[in-house]
């Protein structure tokens, strides 16, 4: 965008045409491998943690720090009625027990009693033990009906950047890790208000969750290892920008009129993109991921829900691996692997869940 504005000084008419062609062509091919990142000041704002949010000189990336004084976070400058939210993220290394790094959408600041939320939350661990993460969904303040799933990763998220994405449309929600869809929620009529329906902002935060994040609160944040640094770059926001329909500094007061906004064109664009459709290869990758790396699912937690929530798709092969608590029967974070089978796979260099696109 900045290069385009600069070129306007050369030939106004010609460059406007080029800009329009480029915008159309980029949107047509937009997918997980071709995402349009924004500059921080084009769509994001500082949320909290004075001094602990550090922007890069090129304004394409940002570091969020946690120290003994405060965590930090940023928020999208606008609210969106459906959208695709994505970022390359690198997590802190070494001892990270008690830490949560979150990438999520929410409207809790506007709809205090009936907020919606979609979460990707990374849970820190003791040094030498892997990060874990969870996804969750709340609709219309249904916090007493949490829909969380917990997983491990097939890589070390503190060594290099990986892309994490949330797709939210009128009919489905998909959570992505790189090019692998890890969870799909299809909207059911029986869900009623439990499906997120109100405009949300994008958030990214790092904070002290010593009371629950690691082993149920057994291990907390050790600030002798601080500062803890998480990094976000090539952040993408695509969706129906509701805030633009209510200009002014206090436009959140008018967001309640969101039903009057027509987002059909934006929704159609979202639902026609690559990241809204799970290919057969990606479906296989998702199944493998869930078989090997998911260690808790609310859909199989029959103590919590005697009848699974309506959006749950009960997969017999998955269900047989879980206790009635929703956790794996084997007591670990993944099923045991027979030695012979493990030996055959020892020389594999590609991740078993890669969509191989």
From Swiss-Prot:
Pfam family, one: XET_C
GO terms for cellular component: apoplast
Listed EC numbers: 2.4.1.207
Protein location: Secreted, Cell wall; Secreted, Extracellular space, Apoplast
Gene Ontology MF: a single term: polysaccharide binding
Glycosylation sites per record: 140, 241, 262, 347
Claim: Transferase is one of the keywords in the record: yes
Domain of life: Eukaryota
Signal peptide positions on this chain: 1-31
Additional free-text comment from the UniProt record: In contrast to group 1 and group 2 endotransglucosylase/hydrolase proteins, it may not contain the ligase activity, and may catalyze endohydrolysis xyloglucan polymers only.
Full protein name: Probable xyloglucan endotransglucosylase/hydrolase protein 29
Species name: Arabidopsis thaliana
